[in-house]
Structure formats: structure tokens, C-alpha cells
A protein has these predicted regions:
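N-terminal, positively charged/glycine-rich alpha-helical extensions of SAM-dependent methyltransferases
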Residues: 5-50
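Class I SAM-dependent methyltransferase SAM/SAH-binding core
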Residues: 79, 84-124
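A conserved beta-strand element that flanks and buttresses the S-adenosyl-L-methionine
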Residues: 135
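Short glycine-dipeptide loop
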Residues: 159-163
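C-terminal alpha-helical "lid/dimerization" subdomain adjacent to the S-adenosyl-L-methionine
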Residues: 164-212
């Protein structure tokens, strides 16, 4: 094959790959410095439960995600956007956790065999039946602005009673190291309060964690 032609093909493939990484945010390899897919996504999925356990014990002093779920009747059907390794997903047979990462879903199924999980995209997921609640825990700070709006709109279309968002406080002051592993965080911090202006905001941990609730 002509060397110039080969170089052009390599350049086109590289450009296409780089373009996808830049704009198809769930597959951005810079998220948490490891990404959520492939080999490094598998490593990320393995260490995530340990990080959650450490944070609950040493930063919050309680099980953060379960403290949100226990605010609601256990019989409620809950759709969990961006479920990760499953700690934020309700434990009953009418609730479901979805995530774009196969690695995260596989790990969630190992840890919580009695919960329901499947691959799904928070912007595009559709269901014949609505859920009582839609939760979104620690997802939106990993999402570009336009896509955050799409996720919120989709959540509203799928929920019967409430939308519950648990995430980094809008007045949080991140370290440079954290910003390096959270490519959309600064935009999130600057805009999330305006984007959720119709939600009731509850301070879970001052300057650290906020809960936003929308009653439908």
C-alpha cells in the first residue's frame, strides 16, 4: 500500500477516534483519569466500590446513597440513571439501574445479584411504563451542559412522582487533581443551580454534597 495513502488512512481514523472521544462523553477516557470502558474501565469498576465505602465512612459518616433511597417507600419503582456499580439502585424487582459502561454493569451484577441492571443511556432510555421516581446520583457532573438538559428532560418523561438528583454541591471547591479527572466539572459547578432552578435544593453536606428534588 502506498505510504502516503496509509498515513492518510491512519490520520483519518485517528481524527475520527479523537472526535468521538471528545463528544461522546460517556466514553471520555479522562473521566476519573481512567474512563468507564475497556481495560481501564474494568479497573475503575473494581476500585469504585472501595472508594464509595471509604467516602461513606470517612467523608460523610453514613451511607450516602442509601440515605437518599430510605427517604422513600421501599415499594416504589425507581429508575436509576448512571447506576455505576449499583450502590444507588433500589433493591426491588420493579426498580432498574442503567449505565453506559458494560464494565460498571458487570461489577454491579456481581455485587448486587438481587438488583436489576442493564446497559442504557440516560439521554435516550425509553420504557413502556413510567417509574415512580427517577434518580441520578453523581452522574451530571460527568456530563456536558447540553447533555445534562437532555438527561433531565428524559427523567421527567419517565417519572410519575419525583426526580431525585444527588451530586457535588454547586459551591464545592475542587482541587486541580480532581478537575484533571473531571473534564466537565467546572461547567457543571457554574451552571447546575440554574439548570435545576425548578428543583428544591437540600444541603446534605455543606459545601460538598447537594440533593435536588423535583415534584411532578
Amino acid at each position: 500500500m502506498n505510504k502516503l495513502l496509509l498515513k492518510n488512512i491512519v490520520f483519518i481514523l485517528y481524527f475520527k477516534y479523537s472526535f468521538c472521544l471528545k463528544y461522546d462523553y460517556p466514553y471520555n477516557p479522562n473521566i476519573h483519569n481512567l474512563g468507564n470502558t475497556g481495560f481501564w474501565g474494568s479497573i475503575h469498576a473494581k476500585i469504585t466500590p472501595k472508594f464509595i465505602s471509604y467516602s461513606d465512612k470517612n467523608l460523610y459518616g453514613f451511607n450516602l446513597r442509601q440515605s437518599v433511597l430510605t427517604r422513600f417507600d421501599k415499594s416504589k419503582s425507581i429508575l436509576d440513571f448512571g447506576c455505576g456499580t449499583g450502590f444507588s439502585t433500589n433493591c426491588n424487582n420493579i426498580s432498574l439501574g442503567i449505565d453506559t459502561s458494560l464494565q460498571m454493569i458487570n461489577e454491579a451484577k456481581k455485587i448486587f445479584p438481587n438488583k436489576k441492571f442493564e446497559i442504557g443511556h440516560a439521554e435516550y432510555f425509553k420504557s413502556m411504563n413510567k417509574y415512580d421516581l427517577v434518580t441520578c446520583m453523581f452522574l451530571l457532573h460527568e456530563v456536558p451542559k447540553v447533555n445534562r438538559k437532555n438527561i433531565i428532560d428524559n427523567a421527567i418523561s419517565l417519572a410519575k412522582e419525583k426526580i431525585i438528583i444527588l451530586d457535588i454541591a454547586s459551591n464545592y471547591n475542587p482541587s486541580k487533581f480532581m478537575i484533571n479527572g473531571e473534564p466537565y466539572l467546572e461547567d457543571y459547578l457554574n451552571n447546575i443551580d440554574n439548570e435545576l432552578e425548578n428543583f428544591k435544593k437540600i444541603i446534605i453536606k455543606e459545601n460538598h454534597i447537594h440533593l435536588w428534588v423535583l415534584e411532578l
